[in-house]
């Protein structure tokens, strides 16, 4: 039997999908602004 693919890790989650990472690139900033416009409670991980 194979292991589960999702092994939760808060640090890895933040490093790959976090707010600081999103703000680094133009595309990432676009994601944040779209989520702000939509009224999301959480903008990033």
From Swiss-Prot:
This is Large ribosomal subunit protein bL34. It comes from Salinispora tropica (strain ATCC BAA-916 / DSM 44818 / JCM 13857 / NBRC 105044 / CNB-440). Signal peptide: none annotated. GO terms for biological process: translation. InterPro entries: Ribosomal_bL34 (IPR000271), Ribosomal_bL34_CS (IPR020939). The keyword Ribosomal protein applies. Gene3D superfamilies: 1.10.287.3980. It comes from the Bacteria. Transmembrane segments: none annotated. The gene is rpmH. Belongs to the bacterial ribosomal protein bL34 family. The keyword NAD does not apply. GO terms for molecular function: structural constituent of ribosome. GO terms for cellular component: ribonucleoprotein complex; ribosome. Keywords: Ribonucleoprotein, Ribosomal protein. HAMAP family: Ribosomal_bL34 (MF_00391).
């Amino acid at each position: 039997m194979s292991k589960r693919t999702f092994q939760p890790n808060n640090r890895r989650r933040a490093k790959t999908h976090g707010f600081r990472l999103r703000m680094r690139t133009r595309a990432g900033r676009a994601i944040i602004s779209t989520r702000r416009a939509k009224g999301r409670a959480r903008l990033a991980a």
